[in-house]
Amino acid sequence: DYILVTPTPQSYDPMGYHKGFTEAAELLAAQPWLLACRRVIWVSSTRVYREAEGGWVDEHSPLNVSEPQARAMVAAEAAIRRARTTTVIRPAGVYGDPQGMLIRRVLSGQGGAPGSSFGNRIHREDLARLITHCLQLDEQGKAVPPTLVAADEDTTPTYEVERWLAQKLGVNLSETPQQAISRANRQCRSALLKEIGFTLTYPSWREGYAAAIKA
């Protein structure tokens, strides 16, 4: 048997992350029936990585234990790893919903102001397929990495994505600078996905958002 866990914060403050991630992992880890499970798939986030100032991160990059929300997610990963064989999948920003936040923002005319922070993404269908791929590898007796960065092959500043979407949707953007937001600036390297034989349906956000717009 396998267990797939996709935790979410109960709220967006530190306590909400502690309850939604750390406490959830500790509760699961304490269950005696977990020993009958072959592998746990724990879906975390690339938020666990330390600020890279535009540099690259991969499965072995330093983790962020200074920010409370990220620290709660790191603690959750560690708790479930101690209890059972686990593959932690760390997705970048998951998209693909035709009514998703970025599309709605662009449709309202917001966005497009230049910025320097890189954005990392993975289409929701690719994330689901990756989870299935890991389970199939394990069933076949093949090696499954303990950690996987789930991101597509095109890290791009968010404002460029907004401008591309605006052109496709026929919308004029305000390009008014937004209030300063604390935004991580990193590029996620997901080369390990190819090494385990996984192929992205949407290798970049262009294919993914084009499909979402048509949906």
Ranges and model annotations:
Residues 136, 180-215:
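C-terminal amphipathic/interface module of NAD(P)-dependent oxidoreductases
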Residues 128-133, 137-184:
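Mid/C-terminal beta-alpha module of Rossmann-like enzyme folds, strongest
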Residues 27-68:
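Conserved Rossmann-fold NAD(P)-dependent oxidoreductase catalytic core, especially the SDR/UDP-sugar
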Residues 45, 77-97:
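Conserved beta-loop-beta element that borders a ligand/cofactor-binding pocket
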Residues 18-22, 55-80, 96, 120-122, ...:
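Short-chain dehydrogenase/reductase
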Residues 1-41, 75:
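NAD(P)-cofactor binding segment of oxidoreductase domains
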Residues 94, 101-104, 113-135:
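Substrate-positioning beta->alpha
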Residues 89, 127, 131, 150, ...:
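Non-catalytic, hydrophobic alpha-helical segments
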